[in-house]
């Protein structure tokens, strides 16, 4: 079975999150000679496969086998993969069974490595991600088997295969402000406290404001208002409360505490409540780390281009891996049809991704 055959097999599993649909058991059977550990919880399955070749660093490949629901608009059955004009059509081709197939095949064919190789797979990335990669990492920490470096095979490329790897990700701070007032009659504004009028005074100083200047890897952390509501949709009653929701995709330069201080600067003296939640923590892997060099060199050899180092996009399970002080980066196929009808990737990309991972395994322990 080659890497394309393997991908076609993985795509045939209807693994809509959090159901792995038997795909993890298949991968376990496919990687003979690797020690398998399952950590399952609340209907989520997580699989860790590992093999120690010799003393040396521990390199892990990570990903997810679950996919989002197919939805409407497909020209073919989304769970019966088909090949048309060099492209493979099915749910999960880009996000991210192509990546899983590529690293599973590369690891399977590895005969010699100066250290330990492993694979971490979950069926809970597209959902809440509560019982997925996080709990497997906790288990690995308990048995002292956390990797030194990790590649997450999420689709990272933008317009050409090999053009971008993720060396970090922005974080995400979600916030809700409730400004309290006193409801009243619109004809008697002096007898009420209209929260809209108060908040309207500070909105120009807050909406779309950058909380930092960014750097060579991260753009500025911007205060983005996502929802603003008050009142009862009538014209003669002023509201007693206003709710404002916002999001900050934060770089490593801005913390949750910085966001709190920013809000307080403009709401100081007002009667308000603030709720903040850091749903993802920003991280950056030093571009001088061995895993970054190994992947860069491998892409240059296979694709003939030098990838840019990016932190753009949303969040992924790499944030959990980085939290355990593991050097983590992400690389995969072009991401132009992820979560869309007729999701597809090219056979050429899949084969090149497999070659890149094979070369990365070689380069990683060569310094």
Swiss-Prot record:
The lineage of its organism: Bacteria, Pseudomonadati, Campylobacterota, Epsilonproteobacteria, Campylobacterales. Homodimer. Its EC number is 3.5.1.18. This is Succinyl-diaminopimelate desuccinylase. It comes from Sulfurovum sp. (strain NBC37-1). It comes from the Bacteria. Binds 2 Zn(2+) or Co(2+) ions per subunit. The active site is at residues 66, 125. Pathway: Amino-acid biosynthesis; L-lysine biosynthesis via DAP pathway; LL-2,6-diaminopimelate from (S)-tetrahydrodipicolinate (succinylase route): step 3/3.
């Amino acid at each position: 079975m080659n890497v394309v055959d393997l991908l076609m097999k993985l795509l045939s599993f209807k693994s809509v999150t959090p159901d792995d649909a038997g795909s993890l058991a298949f991968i376990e059977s496919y990687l003979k000679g690797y020690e398998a550990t399952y950590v399952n919880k609340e209907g989520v399955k997580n699989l860790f496969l590992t093999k120690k070749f010799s003393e040396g660093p521990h390199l892990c490949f990570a990903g997810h086998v679950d996919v989002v629901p197919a939805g409407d608009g497909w020209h073919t059955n989304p769970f019966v993969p088909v090949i048309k004009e060099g492209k493979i059509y099915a749910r999960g081709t880009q996000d991210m069974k192509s990546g899983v197939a590529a690293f599973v095949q590369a690891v399977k064919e590895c005969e010699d490595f100066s250290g330990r190789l492993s694979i971490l797979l979950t069926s809970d990335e597209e959902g809440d991600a509560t019982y997925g990669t996080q709990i497997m990492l906790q288990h690995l920490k308990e048995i002292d088997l956390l990797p030194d470096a990790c590649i997450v095979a999420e689709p990272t490329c933008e317009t050409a295969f090999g053009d971008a790897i993720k060396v970090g990700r922005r974080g995400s701070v979600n916030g809700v402000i409730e400004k309290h007032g006193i409801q009243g009659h619109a004809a008697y504004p002096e007898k009420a406290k209209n929260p809209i009028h108060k908040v309207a005074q500070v909105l120009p100083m807050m909406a779309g404001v950058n909380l930092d200047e960014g750097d060579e890897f991260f753009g500025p952390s911007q205060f983005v208002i996502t929802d603003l509501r008050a009142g009862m949709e009538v014209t003669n009653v002023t509201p007693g409360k206003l709710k404002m929701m916002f999001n900050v995709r934060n770089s490593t330069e801005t913390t949750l505490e910085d966001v709190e201080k920013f809000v307080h600067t403009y709401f100081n003296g007002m009667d308000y409540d603030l709720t903040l939640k850091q749903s993802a923590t920003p991280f950056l892997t030093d571009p001088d780390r061995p895993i970054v060099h190994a992947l860069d060199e491998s892409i240059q050899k296979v694709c003939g281009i030098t990838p840019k180092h990016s932190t753009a996009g949303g969040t992924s399970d790499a944030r959990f891996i980085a939290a355990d002080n593991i050097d983590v980066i992400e690389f995969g196929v072009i991401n132009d049809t992820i979560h869309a009808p007729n999701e597809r990737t090219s056979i050429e990309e899949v084969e090149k991704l497999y070659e890149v991972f094979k070369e990365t395994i070689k380069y990683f322990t060569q310094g």
